[in-house]
Each structure stands twice: as C-alpha cells, then as structure tokens.
Amino acid sequence: MQSPLSLCLFAPEHVAHRLRSIFQGDRHYLSTFQALDDFCAFLEDKPERIDCLLVYYEANSLPVLNRLYEQGRLLPIILLEPSPSALAKTTDEHPTIVYHNAEIHLPESQWSELPTVVDRAIAHYLHLGPICTLPNQTETIPAPIVDESSQSFLLLQQRRLADKLKERLGYLGVYYKRKPSHFYRNFSPQEKQEYLEDLSSQYREIILSYFSDEGTVNDLLDQFVNQAFFADLAISQILEIHMELMDEFSQHLKLEGRSEEVLLDYRLVLIDILAHLGEMYRRSIPREDIPFDVYYQTD
C-alpha cells in the first residue's frame, strides 16, 4: 500500500472544508490550520515530514513564508488563489507572495484538480537548486540563509520526495524507457523464432494452470505480459499464439473423441492477457501534468 502524502493547509475554515472533500481517501493526509501561530508551530516542529504546503493567498500567509525562506526551509507549495475579485483586492493592498521558483499558483476554478497538482508541485520542487532565488525579489525579503544545514534539508527532502513520487507514479514513464533494441520488430529472424517459441511455451503453461487452484497463474500472466510489453509485441502476434495452441488442442481432442467446446473457455485467458497488457500501457504512458524528465529523475 502506498504511504499517503502529508499535506499542510493554512486557510480559512470555508476553504479547509472545501478541500477536505477534495482530498477524501487514503492517498493524502491533510492537516489544516486557521491560526497563524499553530501553523508556524507545526512547520517548525517537523518540517521534514511535510510533503507539500497548501497556502491560501492572503496577507496573513506572507510572514511565515518569508520566515521559511530566510531560514532556507524550502518545501513544495501550492498557493491557492481566491476568486479574481478577491485576488485583485489582495494584490492592491499587500505585496505579492513569493516563496521559491518552484511554487505553483492555482486559481479557485482549478482547485478540484488539487490531487493531481500536488504531484506536479512535488515534481517541480525536485528541480530546485541549493541556492534558490525568488522571481522579482523585493527589498522586503532578505536573502535566504544558504548554509550547510539548509542545503542538507533541501537535498534530503528532494531525495525523500523523489522516492515517494516514484512510488506513487508506479509504471508511469516506463513506456518511454523501453529499449528499441529489445523490440520484437528489431530482432533477427533467429531471435524472433526463439522469442515466439518461449512466449508460446509460457502461454501453454498459463492455459494449463488457468483453472487450477495452485495460485501461480497470476505470476505467469505478469511474466508473459511484461515480456510482451517490453518487446512492444503486436496484439496480432498474441492472437496468433493463442489460435495456434487452440488448433493444437483441438486436434488432440478430436483424436480422443472429445468435444471441442471446452476450448471456448480458454478465450478467458486471451481476454485476461489483453486486459493486463492494456492496463500496463495505460499505467505506463506519462501524464501530461508531470514534467517529462521527472520520470528519469526519480530513478
């Protein structure tokens, strides 16, 4: 089971109530704060345990973010922007809130996408350098303390979150990590023959154990699907393997004087394998909301 992401929210209660409904489930653990002192105390206690900050865009948020920046305590963050009318009033009266170059500003109209945006915020955070500058830095924000402890904090956080993000992404990105030299279409004629013979042997074993109670068929299915996936094998090749084996079994049944109807049940094997393969492709193609190179950084 994946460990949940620990999110820390500083926002008014009406915003917190809305976000609790968005982060239902066991993929995220949301800690909410309305009082600035409580929020600061939580951040200073165990900042390394926080996976992402969610901060409502208002003047009250500025002091604590300035303090974190000055201390070199940089964390993934999403700034929740209120409606345009409320935001206009805020920016007219207060300085712009900036924390670091990897922060994400999310308008209220897109708050429903927060579970996905959290992953993106963490992915952006992984690219922060030890010396992080602010865009359009104002004179009211002193330069950060760049010492060994702050650099160590950033690097340790990035390493921890990279592992956590990789755990959550699973097979995502594997699609583009496959080696063309391992693709079936690039095999030599002899390699193709040996590969298909091996795959056909595996398929036979799956069929013979599919309706047994030994509990090994899932491992056999996974092994077969993995080989087909990384060889970029065409579905037509799998269908051909299935039909050849069914023809072979049909001949045996005829010689024994038995009905061929039993072979119809083995269509379930083909459906199961194609479903597994389709799911692997679905899970492996990178999501558009995650920067492409993060799939390689989390290796």
Swiss-Prot record:
Domain KaiA N-terminal: 1-169
KaiA C-terminal domain: residues covered: 179-287
Disruption phenotype: A triple kaiA-kaiB1-kaiC1 deletion grows normally under photoautotrophic conditions in continuous light. In a light/dark regime has strongly restricted viability and impaired growth behavior, and overall decreased pigments (after 5-6 days); phenotype is more extreme when grown on 0.2% glucose.
GO BP terms in the entry: circadian rhythm
Matching Gene3D superfamilies: 3.40.50.2300, KaiA/RbsU domain
Residue numbers spanned by region PsR domain, binds oxidized quinones: 1-135
Pfam families in the record: KaiA, KaiA_N
Region (Flexible linker): 170-178
Keywords: Biological rhythms
Role, per record: Key component of the KaiABC oscillator complex, which constitutes the main circadian regulator in cyanobacteria. Complex composition changes during the circadian cycle to control KaiC phosphorylation. KaiA stimulates KaiC autophosphorylation, while KaiB sequesters KaiA, leading to KaiC autodephosphorylation. KaiA binding to the KaiC CII domain during the subjective day yields KaiA(2-4):KaiC(6) complexes which stimulate KaiC autophosphorylation.
Complex and partners: Homodimer. The KaiABC1 complex composition changes during the circadian cycle to control KaiC1 phosphorylation. Complexes KaiC1(6), KaiA(2-4):KaiC1(6), KaiB(6):KaiC1(6) and KaiC1(6):KaiB(6):KaiA(12) are among the most important forms, many form cooperatively. KaiA and CikA bind to the same region of the KaiB(fs) form and therefore compete. Interacts with KaiC1 but not KaiC2 or KaiC3. Interacts with itself, not seen to interact with other Kai proteins.
UniProt free text on domains: The N-terminal pseudoreceiver domain (PsR, approximately equal to KaiA N-terminal) binds oxidized quinones. The KaiA C-terminal domain mediates interaction with KaiC, homodimerization, and is responsible for the clock oscillation function.
Family named by the database record: Belongs to the KaiA family.
UniProt name for this protein: Circadian clock oscillator protein KaiA
Gene name of this polypeptide: kaiA
